[in-house]
């Protein structure tokens, strides 16, 4: 798969990911940076995807993180609205997934929890209204037999409240 850009009238089409054998997936739209999107490409290794910031006007790509462990690959990345990598989920072995999170751009990632393939715990989006950059809405079934929407504080690694449960 490739990502293309064109004018609104369909003219001036440009392949933004012109790499043979490389698949491209949209990851994040950056609302406040209209010329940029974050995409996942398997450019360095066909077995694993890594995030890139893509300028949709010029086609310039900037790699944002390296996913170098093919035996325990990163299966998903979480970015904030400014395009900062806040966390990722890494497969560990055949059936476990660990969520890693960092408090700041220059901080190391810390493992927050590990789940199995049967469990859900992933960041749906950050709560920008709270003023706390580490508050996020999480989808989880760890405390229920169905998915719940939870407001979670990653700085304290604790649930703040259940927003919705069915």
Task: Identify the function of each model-found stretch.
Residues 1-166:
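Beta-propeller folds
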């Amino acid at each position: 798969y490739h990502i293309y850009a064109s004018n609104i009238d369909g003219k001036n089409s440009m392949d933004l990911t012109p790499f043979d054998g490389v698949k491209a997936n949209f990851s994040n739209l950056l609302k406040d940076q209209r010329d940029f999107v974050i995409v996942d490409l398997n450019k360095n290794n066909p077995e694993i995807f890594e995030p890139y910031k893509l300028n949709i006007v010029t086609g310039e790509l900037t790699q944002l993180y390296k996913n170098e462990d093919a035996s325990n690959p990163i299966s998903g990345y979480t970015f904030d609205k400014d395009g900062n990598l806040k966390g990722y989920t890494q497969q560990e072995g055949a059936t476990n997934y660990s969520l890693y999170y960092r408090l700041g751009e220059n901080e190391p990632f810390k493992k927050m929890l590990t789940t199995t393939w049967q469990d859900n715990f992933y960041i749906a989006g950050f709560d920008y209204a709270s003023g706390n950059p580490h508050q996020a809405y999480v989808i989880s079934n760890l405390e229920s037999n169905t998915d719940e929407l939870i407001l979670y504080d990653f700085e304290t690694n604790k649930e703040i409240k259940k927003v919705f449960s069915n």
